[in-house]
């Protein structure tokens, strides 16, 4: 049993998670992390840094709920980057889903978002968060319509895609330049768990032919262009920027 849990009645669900995402194989290959399940859902801990606390996915309460209600709607930089300010509600393929925060913002604004995640633990956390969101009275109906997960490498999945999404969204892991004490706990855990996306440059080559309207790449403000390709336009925030590679106009 990879996932630790005090509730026997939860074991069938946890066995399903372990099988679906190959967590036993991951546990055999990895050390320094532990997975726990309780009434708040699935959580990841870095065992040698307990003060960092738990990493989990919660779309229903907390920061996600606050951003959904008060985050600025279609005026947000990410919304402009995918073309929501044009009056469209595009189908977005989030090829580097992570914990799904950006995908959730877009789904809450009406986009249909397909999440790709290749790391088994991250995918399991994301899947668990989605199940709880699907069952929520308030957001469940539109979450079931607007947000779905496919587990696997985006390089493989993009090559297999038969239908063209309007937008392919990329947010590859990039080494953080700040001192470790200043980096968010989540980023520190992720960098140890997943590492940098050393094959990220290749993603743009897969993504561009697949997107019917545009590719959007989220980058730290100090990071170079992905694959050294100059974007059609940029939308900048305080710490990040969205490099937008436009192929065709958005239609309402």
UniProtKB/Swiss-Prot annotation:
It comes from Pseudoalteromonas translucida (strain TAC 125). Specifically methylates the guanosine in position 1516 of 16S rRNA. Keywords: Cytoplasm, Methyltransferase, rRNA processing, S-adenosyl-L-methionine, Transferase. The keyword S-adenosyl-L-methionine applies. Pfam families: SAM_MT. One of its GO terms (molecular function) is rRNA (guanine-N2-)-methyltransferase activity. Its EC number is 2.1.1.242. HAMAP family: 16SrRNA_methyltr_J. It is found in: Cytoplasm. Belongs to the methyltransferase superfamily. RsmJ family. Its main location: cytoplasm. One of its GO terms (cellular component) is cytoplasm. S-adenosyl-L-methionine binds at residues 101-102, 117-118, 153-154, 171. It catalyses: guanosine(1516) in 16S rRNA + S-adenosyl-L-methionine = N(2)-methylguanosine(1516) in 16S rRNA + S-adenosyl-L-homocysteine + H(+). InterPro entries: 16SrRNA_methylTrfase_J, SAM-dependent_MTases_sf. This is Ribosomal RNA small subunit methyltransferase J.
């Amino acid at each position: 049993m990879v996932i630790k849990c005090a509730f026997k009645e939860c074991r069938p669900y946890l066995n399903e998670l372990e099988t679906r995402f190959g967590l036993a194989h991951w546990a055999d290959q990895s050390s320094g992390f532990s997975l726990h399940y309780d009434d708040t859902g699935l959580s990841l801990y870095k065992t040698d840094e307990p003060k960092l606390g738990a990493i989990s996915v919660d779309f229903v309460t907390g920061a996600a709920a606050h951003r959904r209600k008060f985050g600025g709607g279609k005026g947000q930089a990410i919304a402009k980057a995918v073309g929501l300010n044009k009056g469209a509600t595009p189908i977005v393929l989030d090829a580097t889903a992570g914990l799904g925060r950006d995908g959730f913002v877009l789904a809450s604004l009406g986009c249909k978002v397909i999440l790709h995640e290749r790391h088994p633990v991250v995918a399991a956390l994301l899947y668990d968060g989605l199940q709880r969101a699907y069952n929520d009275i308030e957001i469940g109906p539109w979450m079931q319509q607007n947000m779905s997960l496919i587990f696997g490498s985006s390089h493989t999945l993009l090559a297999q895609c038969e239908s063209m999404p309007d937008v392919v969204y990329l947010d590859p892991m990039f080494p953080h330049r700040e001192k470790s004490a200043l980096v968010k706990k989540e980023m520190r855990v992720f960098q140890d768990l997943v590492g940098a996306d050393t094959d990220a440059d290749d993603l743009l080559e897969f993504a561009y032919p697949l997107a019917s309207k545009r590719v959007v790449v989220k980058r730290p403000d100090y990071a170079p262009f992905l694959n050294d390709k100059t974007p059609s336009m940029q939308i900048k925030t305080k710490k990040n920027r969205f490099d937008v590679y436009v192929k065709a106009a958005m239609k309402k």
